[in-house]
């Protein structure tokens, strides 16, 4: 991952969590 925003994953629900690469759905936070 480049550390930026990644496209939503199938396991990630909009407004709930954000898919960060293959890490799965993670909280909507700016983690770098």
From Swiss-Prot:
> Which controlled-vocabulary keywords does the entry list?
Allergen, IgE-binding protein, IgG-binding protein
Locate the region Disordered: 1-32
UniProt keyword DNA repair present: no
Q: Which GO terms describe its molecular function?
A: IgE binding; IgG binding
Q: Does the keyword field hold Ligase?
A: no
Protein's recorded name: Allergen Asp fl 3
Source species of the chain: Aspergillus flavus
